[in-house]
C-alpha cells in the first residue's frame, strides 16, 4: 500500500511523545519528517536511526516510532516487519504485542492477530482492548460468510497506480475526486514518495451511460501542492476543500466560479490558524460546514470532527461534535447526506480494522449512537469518504483494501434490488395431472387489486412480486371447483423465487350431499353443529367466484307432501341465508325444497336401493330410522360457472417490477450540466 500524504487521509497532527534525546541530528530529522507528515520518509529515517548503537537505550522506542510512521502512511506491511522484529527480540513495552496484532488484523491475517492479542492479554491481564479485538475478528469472519445485497466493486475506469480517492457528486451527472496521477499539476515530486502532488479531477456520465476521461478542474483551484477532497454547494458554484502549502501545513479553502473556471481559493480560518484542518463537507442547505481537526479546543483525543454554522459571509466558531461521535482515537472524513445523516470514518468505534465507516442521525438536537454500516462497505483495511445517493442504494467510497490498483482507490457500491417471483403450477387434485388454461388471479393485499393470466401448456404461470408484500392467489377452471393459495415477500431480506402448486377438484356431474347440515326438529333453524360444513361451503363459493349453485333440501316421507315441501323449502333457504350473511351473492344461489320427491339411493345389503317409504318399512325395525335419516339431506348442484356479478376488485395491467437500485445521480439538479 502506498503512502497518501498529509492530512487528507490521516489527519494525525499530534506530535510524538518527547524523547529523552541525545543531540542526534538523524533522530531530529526523522522527527521533523514526522511532524511534516512525511510519514513514509519518517518511517525509513526512524528505522535507520534505530540502528545507531549510541541510541541503544532508546532503540525500542525509536522502532515503535518507525512503525507508527508507517501506519500513519498506511504502509502496513512495513509496520508489520518492524513489529515482527521487535516481538522476536522480546519487547520491553507490552503494547508492542497489541500494535503488532493491530497491523496483522489490518492485513487480514486474523489467526496470527488473535495469537498476538492473546499474548497481549497474558502480559497485560485485565485489559479491555485485547478481548474486544478478538470478538470483533470473530464477528467479521462470521459476517463474511453471511449473504449480502451490497456489492462493492473497484471503479477501475478512474483508478491508477497512484492514489485516487475522495469521490463526490458534482453537478447533475458528474463526480470530482482527488488523484496523484500523471496529469496532476506541479513539476516537482512530493518529498519522501517521489509522486505527484494531488489535484482535483472531474468526470461526467453521458446519456449513453459512458464516463468521460477524468480531467483536472479548470481555473485556479488546483495548486502545485496537495489538494484534498472537495464538497460543493447545491448549485455547484462553490467548492470547499483543503490544501497543503509548501511548508506542509494544511488549511481549509473555498473556491468560487462564475463560469467554467474556478477562481483562486480563499482560506477559511478557525482557531486562529493555530491548528491544521482538513476534509471539509458542506451540509445540503449550505448552512453548516463539517471538517476534521486535531489539537483543537474541545477535542477528545486523536482526530475529531467539528462543525461551524454559517454567519453572513463567514462562519461562527467551530464546535466539537461531542463524545457520541468523537472518541479518544481518530474520527475523520465527514460526509453529510441529503437526509441530514452524518457518515464518517472512525478508528475509535467498534469496527473491523483501520478506518471504518459509521452513520449517525440527528434526533432532537443530538446525534444518535453511530452505527457501523457493515460489510462489505467496511473491510479490515481503511474505508473512508462514503457517499450515497438520496435513496442510499448506490454511491462511492475510498479504500486501500485488497484489489486496489494504487494506495487508495475509488470504489463503487450498490445495493442490488430485491427481486421476487412466484411460479404457480395448477394440477387436478384427484389425478395430479397438470392443467393448462386455468385462470390464476394474484391479489395484492390488503387492497385486493389483482393481476391475472392463464396457465401455459405446463400448467404454470409466473408473476413478479413487490417486496414486503402479501398476496392471495385464486385458481379457477371450467368444470373445476376453485382453490386458493398465498405467498408473501414480507420480511424477506434477499431476492427469492417462490414455487406454489395449487390443486383444484373436478366438479362431479351429479349432485353432492352436504354432510352434517342439521336442523332442529320440524324446523328450518340450523343447528350449531352445522356451522363447520356451512363454512366449508362458504369457502368453496369464495374460491369459485363464477360458480352458480342450487341448494336442494329433502325430507323423509313421514308427513304430508305439503308439509314436507314447505319445510324443505325453508331449510334450503336457511342454507342460502347463511351464505348470504357470509358475503356470497344471492344471485349465485337457487334454494329449492324437494320434500320427499327424490328419495336417496344408498347401498343396502350389497345393492344400490332407492330409499322409498315402502322399501324402508320392509327393513328391520332397528335399521329404519337410519334409512329415513339418509333421505333427510341437503344437496348442492353446480348450475354453471358463468356468474360475473359486480366487479369488486381492480385489475392491474402488466407486471409489478421490483424496485431497482436507483440512479447514481437520482434527484440531482444542482449546478449546470457538463
Which residue ranges define each predicted feature?
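Short, acidic Ser/Thr/Gly-rich low-complexity loop/linker segments typical of extracellular
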Residues: 444-461
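Periplasmic OmpA-like peptidoglycan-binding domain that tethers envelope proteins to the cell wall
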Residues: 346, 351-353, 554-674
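A short, solvent-exposed beta-strand micro-motif common in secreted/extracellular proteins
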Residues: 469-480
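Short, conserved micro-motifs composed of acidic
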Residues: 24, 99, 106, 110-112, ...
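Periplasmic peptidoglycan-binding/anchoring modules of Gram-negative envelope and division proteins
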Residues: 519-553, 576, 580, 636-640, ...
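A short, amphipathic beta-strand motif
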Residues: 30, 420-429, 502
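Short, ordered, surface-exposed loop/turn motifs in non-cytosolic proteins
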Residues: 302, 431-445
Amino acid at each position: 500500500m502506498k503512502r497518501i500524504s498529509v492530512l487528507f487521509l490521516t489527519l494525525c497532527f499530534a506530535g510524538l511523545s518527547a524523547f529523552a534525546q541525545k543531540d542526534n541530528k538523524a533522530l531530529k530529522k526523522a522527527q521533523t519528517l514526522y511532524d511534516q507528515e512525511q510519514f513514509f520518509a519518517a518511517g525509513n529515517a526512524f528505522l535507520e536511526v534505530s540502528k545507531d548503537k549510541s541510541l541503544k537505550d532508546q532503540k525500542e522506542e525509536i522502532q515503535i516510532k518507525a512503525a507508527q510512521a508507517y501506519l500513519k502512511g498506511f504502509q502496513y506491511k512495513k509496520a508489520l516487519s518492524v513489529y515482527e522484529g521487535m516481538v522476536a527480540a522480546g519487547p520491553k513495552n507490552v503494547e508492542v504485542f497489541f500494535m503488532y496484532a493491530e497491523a496483522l488484523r489490518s492485513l487480514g491475517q486474523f489467526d496470527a492477530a488473535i495469537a498476538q492479542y492473546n499474548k497481549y492479554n497474558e502480559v497485560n491481564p485485565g485489559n479491555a482492548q485485547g478481548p474486544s479485538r478478538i470478538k470483533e475478528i470473530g464477528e467479521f469472519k462470521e459476517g463474511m460468510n453471511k449473504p449480502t445485497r451490497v456489492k462493492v466493486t473497484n471503479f477501475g475506469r478512474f483508478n491508477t497506480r497512484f492514489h485516487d480517492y475522495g469521490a463526490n457528486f458534482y453537478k447533475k451527472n458528474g463526480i470530482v475526486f482527488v488523484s496523484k496521477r500523471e496529469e496532476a499539476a506541479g513539476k516537482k515530486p512530493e518529498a519522501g514518495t517521489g509522486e505527484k502532488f494531488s489535484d482535483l479531477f472531474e468526470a461526467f456520465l453521458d446519456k449513453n451511460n459512458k464516463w468521460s476521461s477524468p480531467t483536472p478542474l479548470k481555473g485556479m483551484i488546483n495548486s502545485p501542492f496537495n489538494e484534498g477532497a472537495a464538497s460543493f454547494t447545491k448549485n455547484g458554484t462553490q467548492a470547499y476543500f483543503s490544501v497543503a502549502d509548501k511548508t506542509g501545513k494544511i488549511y481549509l479553502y473555498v473556491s468560487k466560479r462564475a463560469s467554467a473556471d474556478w477562481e483562486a481559493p480563499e482560506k477559511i480560518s478557525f482557531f486562529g490558524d493555530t491548528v491544521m484542518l482538513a476534509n471539509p463537507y458542506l451540509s445540503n442547505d449550505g448552512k453548516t460546514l463539517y471538517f476534521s481537526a486535531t489539537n483543537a479546543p474541545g477535542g477528545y483525543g486523536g482526530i475529531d470532527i467539528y462543525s461551524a454554522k454559517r454567519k453572513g459571509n463567514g462562519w461562527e466558531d467551530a464546535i466539537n461534535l461531542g463524545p457520541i461521535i468523537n472518541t479518544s482515537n481518530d474520527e475523520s472524513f465527514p460526509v453529510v447526506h441529503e437526509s441530514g445523516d452524518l457518515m464518517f470514518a472512525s478508528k475509535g468505534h467498534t469496527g473491523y480494522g483501520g478506518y471504518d465507516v459509521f452513520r449517525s442521525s440527528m434526533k432532537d438536537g443530538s446525534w444518535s449512537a453511530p452505527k457501523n454500516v457493515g460489510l462489505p462497505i467496511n473491510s479490515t483495511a481503511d474505508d473512508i469518504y462514503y457517499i450515497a445517493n438520496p435513496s442510499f442504494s448506490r454511491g462511492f467510497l475510498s479504500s486501500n483494501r485488497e484489489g486496489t490498483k494504487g494506495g487508495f482507490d475509488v470504489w463503487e457500491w450498490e445495493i442490488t434490488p430485491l427481486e421476487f417471483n412466484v411460479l404457480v403450477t395448477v394440477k387436478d387434485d384427484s389425478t395430479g395431472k397438470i392443467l393448462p388454461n386455468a385462470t390464476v388471479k394474484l391479489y395484492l393485499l390488503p387492497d385486493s387489486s389483482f393481476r391475472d393470466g392463464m396457465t401455459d401448456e405446463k400448467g404454470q404461470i409466473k408473476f413478479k412480486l413487490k417486496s414486503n408484500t402479501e398476496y392471495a392467489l385464486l385458481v379457477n377452471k371450467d368444470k373445476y371447483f376453485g382453490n386458493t393459495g398465498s405467498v408473501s415477500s414480507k420480511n424477506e431480506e434477499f431476492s427469492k423465487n417462490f414455487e406454489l402448486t395449487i390443486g383444484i377438484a373436478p366438479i362431479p356431474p351429479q349432485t353432492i350431499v352436504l354432510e352434517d347440515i342439521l336442523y332442529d326438529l320440524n324446523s328450518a333453524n340450523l343447528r350449531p353443529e352445522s356451522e363447520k360444513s356451512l363454512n366449508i361451503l362458504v369457502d368453496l363459493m369464495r374460491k369459485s367466484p363464477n360458480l352458480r349453485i342450487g341448494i336442494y333440501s329433502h325430507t323423509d316421507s313421514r308427513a304430508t307432501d305439503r308439509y314436507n315441501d314447505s319445510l324443505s323449502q325453508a331449510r334450503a333457504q336457511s342454507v342460502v341465508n347463511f351464505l348470504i350473511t357470509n358475503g356470497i351473492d344471492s344471485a349465485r344461489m337457487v334454494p329449492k325444497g324437494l320434500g320427499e320427491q327424490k328419495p336417496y339411493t344408498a347401498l343396502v345389503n350389497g345393492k344400490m336401493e332407492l330409499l322409498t317409504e315402502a322399501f324402508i318399512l320392509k327393513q328391520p325395525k332397528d335399521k329404519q330410522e337410519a334409512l329415513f335419516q339418509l333421505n333427510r339431506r341437503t344437496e348442492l348442484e353446480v348450475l354453471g360457472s358463468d356468474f360475473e356479478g359486480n366487479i369488486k376488485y381492480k385489475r392491474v395491467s402488466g407486471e409489478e417490477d421490483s424496485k431497482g437500485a436507483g440512479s447514481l445521480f437520482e434527484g440531482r439538479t444542482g449546478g449546470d450540466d457538463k
